[in-house]
């Protein structure tokens, strides 16, 4: 029935329609993102919760419950009693905590224990056994690098010696021990406060000669210790 009253029908503008649609979509996206964040928080281990890490340590299988915040250095020394890996600077600058992870030089102070999952880890305590398994151990049952350090008096206080030896093994394996200058360059990530560098270089060159190393590679220079450790960088690429 027409009562004579004028009526105006409402028709939304194009701008109003788009604005409303965008606001609705934004609200839905925000809700979805909030749900994702809540799910991630729910899956995250509670503070202080331990995680299981399975790896090989000096040829023996290990499954350990570790604090995700704990470093490999502390795990090896305090958890496993392998005190040959030394505490130095805890900043990746001295090389005293050098270990091998999947054959590469890695600083224990910059590596989380949880990163060792599935890895083969060798410390100074396992080096002689590794040499024996490879058929290169000396008559005294030492790795050739260990024997060369003894013969050349390549230490004084001895605190840095385990890290020096662990780096030297990699430097030799990668073919960077052809001269004293080259040894010094590729061993530069390891500091010796007693300044036994001439004897250290001589020991590395002697061991390289005895082992007949000819391989080529990246070496153990300090620049390779910074950032993501090499054994893990490749897995994450």
Task: Give the location of each predicted region.
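Signature of N-terminal electron-transfer/Fe-S-associated modules in redox systems
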Residues: 2-237
């Amino acid at each position: 029935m027409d009562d004579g009253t004028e009526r105006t029908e409402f028709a939304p503008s194009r701008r109003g329609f788009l604005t409303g649609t965008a606001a609705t979509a934004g609200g839905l996206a925000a809700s979805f993102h909030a749900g994702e964040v809540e799910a991630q928080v729910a899956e995250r281990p509670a503070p202080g919760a331990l995680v299981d890490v399975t790896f090989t340590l000096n040829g023996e299988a290990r499954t350990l419950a570790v604090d995700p915040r704990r470093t490999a250095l502390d795990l090896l020394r305090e958890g496993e009693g392998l005190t040959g890996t030394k505490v130095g600077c805890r900043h990746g600058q001295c090389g005293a905590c050098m270990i091998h992870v999947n054959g590469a030089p890695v600083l224990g102070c910059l590596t989380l224990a949880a990163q060792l999952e599935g890895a083969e880890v060798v410390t100074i305590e396992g080096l002689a056994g590794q040499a024996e398994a490879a058929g290169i151990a000396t008559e005294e049952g030492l790795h050739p690098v260990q024997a060369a350090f003894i013969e050349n008096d390549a230490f004084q206080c001895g605190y840095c010696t385990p890290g020096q030896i662990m780096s030297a093994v990699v430097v030799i394996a990668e073919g960077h021990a052809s001269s004293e200058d080259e040894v010094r360059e590729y061993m530069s990530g390891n500091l010796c406060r007693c300044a036994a560098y001439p004897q250290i270089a001589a020991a590395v060159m002697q061991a390289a000669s005895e082992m007949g190393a000819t391989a080529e590679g990246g070496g153990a220079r300090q620049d390779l210790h910074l950032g993501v450790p090499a054994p893990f960088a490749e897995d994450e690429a």
